[in-house]
């Protein structure tokens, strides 16, 4: 169950799962090539892709950009601990952080801190500015810890989809 609901992925057949795997590898693949790879003719393949989009399995298509070419080579993770004494502090923080383009990811986590943020900036000076002028001023922020990535060993957005 997902939030009290049935897990929709359990109803996917082998062909749907293969379609999703192929689209994760190459979102720009032509329908004709995709249909060959999954063993369907083009029309039913396209119908399945459109159904998977309608049902929310496919949320969109995007280009993977090289951050080192685009002045965003410093990858930083930030632990955020909130002052839990304020009412609605989590909701206020969530609303505020969603407006920040600099934040690529924000996750509410269990453990010794409340949120884990991911950001990319040009350099340490830019990060110091982001921290001092933006992150520390977010609603309810009590403490932060910064982790600067020295080397990206593995990075992937792909989900493991078992084809059974």
From Swiss-Prot:
Biological process annotations from GO: alanine catabolic process; regulation of DNA-templated transcription; response to L-leucine
Keyword set includes Transcription regulation: yes
Domain HTH asnC-type: 12-73
PROSITE patterns associated with the record: HTH_ASNC_1 (PS00519), HTH_ASNC_2 (PS50956)
GO cellular component terms attached to this protein's record: cytosol
Keywords: Activator, DNA-binding, Transcription, Transcription regulation
Signal peptide: none
A GO molecular-function annotation: sequence-specific DNA binding
Function text: Mediates a global response to leucine. Exogenous leucine affects the expression of a number of different operons; lrp mediates this effect for at least some of these operons. For example it is regulator of the branched-chain amino acid transport genes.
Assembly mode: Homodimer.
Protein name from the UniProt record: Leucine-responsive regulatory protein
Species whose genome carries this gene: Serratia marcescens
């Amino acid at each position: 169950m997902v939030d009290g609901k049935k897990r929709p992925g359990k109803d996917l057949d082998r062909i749907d799962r293969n379609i999703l795997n192929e689209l994760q590898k190459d979102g720009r693949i032509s329908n004709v090539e995709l249909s060959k790879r999954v063993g369907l003719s083009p029309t039913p393949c396209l119908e399945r892709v459109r159904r998977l989009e309608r049902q929310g399995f496919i949320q969109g298509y995007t280009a993977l950009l090289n951050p080192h070419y685009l002045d965003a080579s410093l990858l930083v993770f930030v632990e955020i601990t909130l002052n839990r004494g304020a009412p609605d502090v989590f909701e206020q923080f969530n609303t505020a952080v969603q407006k920040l383009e600099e934040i690529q990811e924000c996750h509410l986590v269990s453990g010794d801190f409340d949120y884990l943020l991911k950001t990319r900036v040009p350099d340490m000076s830019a990060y110091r500015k982001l921290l001092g002028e933006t992150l520390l001023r977010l609603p309810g922020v009590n403490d932060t810890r910064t982790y600067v990535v020295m080397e990206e060993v593995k990075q992937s957005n792909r989900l493991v989809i078992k084809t059974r």
